[in-house]
């Protein structure tokens, strides 16, 4: 495939610097790109790498254009996004199977499968399921009774949707995702042990959500567990029963969210964050990696640590800890001098 740089610029709505007729035959990171390949630059950490790059053209922000004088450039207000748009438009190699239901798939009664859907080998679709247009189920997926799948969804192999799950449009679920399993609900019943609390709720996943490998989203005990429009959930995340995640939030790998916690819009939970149950995280908040959250977090706060605290407070506390060794030396010296004085006075 060969595309003129001017075609890419027109598609993106970007200004060009340099020869717009230059051919682009591929995409690559800065340090690997060759003369016919397109790359992008957003992070000044890689400035030296960018200057040495052999890329045929680079997508850059307006504030960075001067350091690339003489290079072929596309000037963008969001270089990373626009690079992704180019990849999606011309270089996306994602495999999509042909429409149809594989003969080994098991389809229950009263199932509605719309046009142009693809149901892969050994999928199991229980009674009363609705699958809307252009949705793809790769092999070995399970869809529980009365589940609804929206249009243009993509379920990779071994995705499990238990009963009464509701999935919006353009949702992507990666291998091993389990949605709608029982929440962790057990009533103490001594001396016998615990009585299992029936989990009779469901899960609602809004449009444009992506959930990556081996993540579990539990059904509500009563009522729904909800994931808001456009939110992205990484690998190995646990979402407890009746959790609500707002729109366009980012949940990074190995996060654990306990039951009934409410997470706002545009929130970021970095890797291995843990949340206790029944707390609220305000819109736009950021929780840094490995933080432990046991209380509500206000909107737009940046929090860190375990227990979690505002980032600046945490940095001051760490600075004080780093001074303790020197302080300990001073205290020991004072103790030594005091001992000498006491010995002198006793003579």
Curated annotation (Swiss-Prot):
PROSITE patterns: HEXAPEP_TRANSFERASES. The active site is at residue 241. One of its GO terms (biological process) is lipid A biosynthetic process. InterPro entries: Hexapep, LpxD, Trimer_LpxA-like_sf, UDP_GlcNAc_AcTrfase_non-rep. Gene3D superfamilies: Hexapeptide repeat proteins (2.160.10.10), MurE/MurF, N-terminal domain (3.40.1390.10). Its EC number is 2.3.1.191. Pathway: Bacterial outer membrane biogenesis; LPS lipid A biosynthesis. CDD domains: LbH_LpxD. Keywords: Acyltransferase, Lipid A biosynthesis, Lipid biosynthesis, Lipid metabolism, Repeat, Transferase. It catalyses: a UDP-3-O-[(3R)-3-hydroxyacyl]-alpha-D-glucosamine + a (3R)-hydroxyacyl-[ACP] = a UDP-2-N,3-O-bis[(3R)-3-hydroxyacyl]-alpha-D-glucosamine + holo-[ACP] + H(+). One of its GO terms (cellular component) is membrane. One of its GO terms (molecular function) is N-acyltransferase activity. It comes from the Bacteria. PANTHER family: UDP-3-O-ACYLGLUCOSAMINE N-ACYLTRANSFERASE (PTHR43378), UDP-3-O-ACYLGLUCOSAMINE N-ACYLTRANSFERASE 1, MITOCHONDRIAL-RELATED (PTHR43378:SF2). Belongs to the transferase hexapeptide repeat family. LpxD subfamily. Homotrimer. Catalyzes the N-acylation of UDP-3-O-acylglucosamine using 3-hydroxyacyl-ACP as the acyl donor. Is involved in the biosynthesis of lipid A, a phosphorylated glycolipid that anchors the lipopolysaccharide to the outer membrane of the cell. NCBIfam families: lipid_A_lpxD (TIGR01853), PRK00892.1 (NF002060). This is UDP-3-O-acylglucosamine N-acyltransferase. The gene is lpxD.
